Amino acid sequence: MAWTPPPPRTGHPYYMHDAIYAQPGALRLVTRGQEATFAAAAERLQAMERVLLSGIGTSWHATLVGELLFAHVGRLGHRVRAFHSFEFKNSWPEPDPRTGVVVVSHRGTKRFSLEALAKAKAGGGVAVVITGKGSGEGLAIADYTLRTVDQEASAAHTISYTCAMMLLAALAAEMGGADDVRHELEGIPDHLALLLGQEAWDDLAARFATRRCYYFIGGGPNTATALEAALKMNEASYAKTVGMNCEQFLHGPWAALEADDVVFVIAPPGPSYERCLAVARAAREVGAPVVALVREDDKEIAALAAETIAIPPVNELLSPLLTVVPLQLFTYHTALQRGANPDTMRADQPAHGRARASLAL
């Protein structure tokens, strides 16, 4: 049955707010009842010569995290690669029976994700879909379907993103027989519940609501967090925003940084930490304030930051399940500060509504 959006909200709490705070409960439940599908899909994917992950927008960002999870936790190594659905459809060679494809699509209606799935099926390999409940019928051709949550009422997707990452992590753990990761995943909802209550998010947003540009910088799996945070800021608060890998930022983009910008550095312990530290130092030299998402015992980046957000200690590959949520909340409260409706992606404004109708997504 086709999903019908609920009536729009015109004030706080918007639908985006409700979805953000529903994430701990959703993450606790998202794998339940799907154990047999996990086992069967994991066995088929592990037997493939290569595995490709595909998505668009927020779903593409989930696949970037999934790529590293499949490579390390799922023990696929160099046999896995993530693609934007548009590029997979148009630029990647035709899959063959030795190729497994995992398509992530919350709504199940985006043209190029559907075409990527059709291309995967035509190749004869295994096709797995990670999607929301009540998603489009075009995904029904997949061999295996893993469900996240009900369709999001807000156009700025949040809960479907973290639930998709949770399913990718659980699938990787199933492929790799990683009991330690399975155990750590069980603790993520409790970490997240504590994280949601630890900061005065409206005060943080009020402090930085009028900045010229927002930079979100991370490395490793949190490159995806940086990209996702920037996308959420575009969608929900309509702000000028950049999301980027830490090393990429240091190779030129830093030159555009000004003192009236703000730089969010997403830097849990890991191989990218030292380069994230270099980003924080550069921002401080320019005079741009740094907001650091770091572990609570961090000393170096925290010392350079105007604000710190403490991230619980978890496996770096799982950290995007936590690091993205404070940035979702910052985005939401920044939207309120800027007088934006975070649910509509400006479709309620005539010019942007006409632009949206012309996009043929």
What are these regions (language model features)?
Residues 112, 156, 221-222, 275, ...:
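Residues at the start of alpha-helices and the adjacent loop-to-helix junctions
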Residues 36, 43-194, 254, 266-313, ...:
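Glycine-rich phosphate-binding loops that contact phosphosugars or nucleotide phosphates
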